[in-house]
Design a protein with these regions (language model features):
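Non-catalytic substrate-recognition and accessory regions of acyl/acetyltransferase enzymes
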Residues: 1-74, 83, 106-112, 138-144
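Hydrophobic transmembrane signal anchors and adjacent membrane-proximal interface regions, especially
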Residues: 3-7, 95, 132
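Short secondary-structure junctions
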Residues: 29, 129-136
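Acyl-donor binding region in acyl/amide transferases
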Residues: 65-129
């Protein structure tokens, strides 16, 4: 049975998995659990199958500085890194996390990514129902 876990502190036992982030390892772990940020883990039985880091913003970020802003009234959930340990878990992670945010944060009305400009990211997001919103200098925003 799959279970979505929210991680809001580096003291959480699942925070240890942040070291495995292959997409944005340079973002400090404490930033990922700050006021406008949440890390989510998808567990299948007791095994972690996927992780995603989400930043809540008041705009769709086009660069890392905009992603790191701390707005007072966020309306956009930005999925900025996702990785999985099991085939197919990334898709489940995105869908489960979006549902959780919709149910728990009604002020969040847009769901986008801040993705690297890679073919793997493009295929992943388009295959899972996103559309290309904007291509930036060093990233792409996909909209769910």
């Amino acid at each position: 049975m799959k279970k979505l876990v929210t991680i809001k502190s580096l003291d959480h036992p699942l925070a240890q998995y942040l070291k495995d982030d292959p997409v944005r390892p340079d973002i400090p772990h404490d930033v990922r659990v700050s006021a406008n940020s949440t890390v989510f883990a998808l567990q299948d039985e007791e095994k972690v199958s996927a992780m995603v880091c989400v930043k809540y913003q008041d705009q769709i970020p086009s660069n890392l500085d905009e992603l790191m802003d701390e707005p007072k009234h966020p309306t956009v959930a930005v999925f900025y890194t996702i990785w999985s340990y099991m085939a197919g878990a990334g898709r489940d992670m995105i869908l489960e996390t979006r549902k959780w945010i919709e149910d728990n944060n009604p002020e969040i009305t847009e769901f986008v990514t801040y993705s690297p400009k890679t073919e793997m990211a493009r295929k992943f997001h388009l295959k899972n129902g996103a559309s290309t919103y904007r291509e930036n200098e060093d990233s792409v925003n996909y909209k769910y």
